[in-house]
Curated annotation (Swiss-Prot):
Stated name of the protein: Large ribosomal subunit protein bL35
Record bears the keyword Ribonucleoprotein: yes
Gene (UniProt): rpmI
Domain of life, source organism: Bacteria
Lineage of origin: Bacteria, Bacillati, Bacillota, Bacillota incertae sedis, Caldicellulosiruptorales
The UniProt record lists the keyword Ribonucleoprotein: yes
Length: 65
């Protein structure tokens, strides 16, 4: 079997927690921020766990991470 290629775009966006869960940043924090409330912008800073429905796809794209 040949080596599997890592999806580099996704590898730059995902980190793995100590317990093995995949972490990602929230979208919507780059521009057009004046129309968003402080609370909304503050909550967009947080990292979240990748949803269980997407974990299988992430594992396939990141075979060695």
């Amino acid at each position: 079997m040949p080596k599997l290629k890592t999806h580099r775009g996704l590898a730059k966006r995902i980190k793995i927690s100590g317990s093995g869960k995949y972490l990602r940043k929230k979208a919507g924090k780059s521009h057009l921020l004046s129309g968003k409330s402080r609370k909304r912008k503050r909550n967009l800073k947080k990292t979240v766990i990748v949803d269980s429905t997407n974990v299988k796809a992430v594992k396939k794209l990141l075979p060695y991470l």
